[in-house]
Curated annotation (Swiss-Prot):
Residues 1-5 form the signal peptide. Expressed by the venom gland. PANTHER family: PHOSPHOLIPASE A2, PHOSPHOLIPASE A2 FAMILY MEMBER. This is Basic phospholipase A2 beta-bungarotoxin A-AL2 chain. It is found in: Secreted. Keywords: Calcium, Disulfide bond, Hydrolase, Lipid degradation, Lipid metabolism, Metal-binding, Neurotoxin, Presynaptic neurotoxin, Secreted, Signal, Toxin. Heterodimer; disulfide-linked. The A chains have phospholipase A2 activity and the B chains show homology with the basic protease inhibitors. Its cofactor is Ca(2+).
Amino acid sequence: FLLGAANIPPHPLNLINFMEMIRYTIPCEKTWGEYADYGCYCGAGGSGRPIDALDRCCYVHDNCYGDAANIRDCNPKTQSYSYKLTKRTIICYGAAGTCARIVCDCDRTAALCFGNSEYIERHKNIDTKRHCR
């Protein structure tokens, strides 16, 4: 079993950070994984119009990462950053305008948005070809 685990690529550090932010902001009965295939934009890719407020959070996050990727040498999916979870909010550290700070702010904004948006069960695992045009 352990030898097989060695072949599993590690999660990028910022994905782990983002998952921790989400866990901090969402109701305890939901796991971060329940957001991975929700609506038209939560999860890999995205198309069409967001189907609700929660999906809109993911749409904004995707666009934020797209903007960050336009910064020289900035890969938002692998960029590490520093942050603190405190008093029901998230604080990002680092100089404004740096890749790390921008990516942290993208994740922070999305996680807080998730915490303020209703999770609608029927929008999980939707037929994206039909609903996301």
